[in-house]
Amino acid sequence: SASEALNKNCGAGELSPTDSWSWEDTRHSEHIMIKSLEKTEPGKIIAAALDGDGDRCLLIESTDKGCRVIDGDEMADHILRGAKGDWTLAASIESDLALSTSLSRLDANVEFIQTAVGDRWLSDALKNSTSNKIGVEDSGHIVLSAPNPNGGRCLVGDGAASLLATLCAMAVSEKPDKFTRGFKKRVSIKDTKRELWDGKNSLAEDVEEIIKSSLGDLQRKKIVGESNLLLLEGKGVSLGIRNSGTQAKTNVSLRVRANVNPEPPLQAMDEVIKFLNKHLV
């Protein structure tokens, strides 16, 4: 299709929030932007990519051995580290736990709201806030307040505006430390019978028991807009299971805070995936 041709091997749509490359890797990358990067000293912003419709942005930073993606969570953290006053942060259930659990280090006073996946849920969570607003997904969706052409203000997800806001925030000279990235892993179980999973039935109860037997008494959380989500959180761990909205697959997402050993949660995740492969495929 025309949209596939437009985005093939370029843009944010071909990048993952956790991607990184050695300089040797970049030379052989199929991604046009990554392949064009030249070796430089670490710690520099060397590229930025928008997605096909321009509402997402991801940055590329040079490292000691190559380069890596700066995802939406880190971009939002840069903005908040340069901020003052009262803010509301909305972040999806796929955002880094370290961002939402370390807000006390900031100079700004930040209220946190966890949302469903999708930038429309970020906007929905922020619409009634009277403070400064920012919504984020690690995929590079950032929702910010902007002037409304008809008067007042509105919420906008604009990749170019997100890029400029992040670069301006990076230029602030004195600011709090950045957050320490936690561990994240997502696995998609393909060809699932999605009608068998609703996040509340006996199958979900079995999965909850598997997780709690390994990780202890985590708390089940409900998120507006995620009708089939089973989300268990606590002790620096978040494990969620939800159906894809468009494809025959069920996604298992694990998030672990930076100071928590990821091995026990990973083992629990593996058990859940084996169980769901047996009962959903």
Enumerate the predicted regions with their spans.
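Cysteine protease catalytic core and zymogen-processing segment of caspase-like enzymes
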Residues: K65-K84
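Short, acidic/turn-prone active-site loops that include or flank metal/cofactor-
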Residues: A2-G13, G72-D77, E94, T115-R120
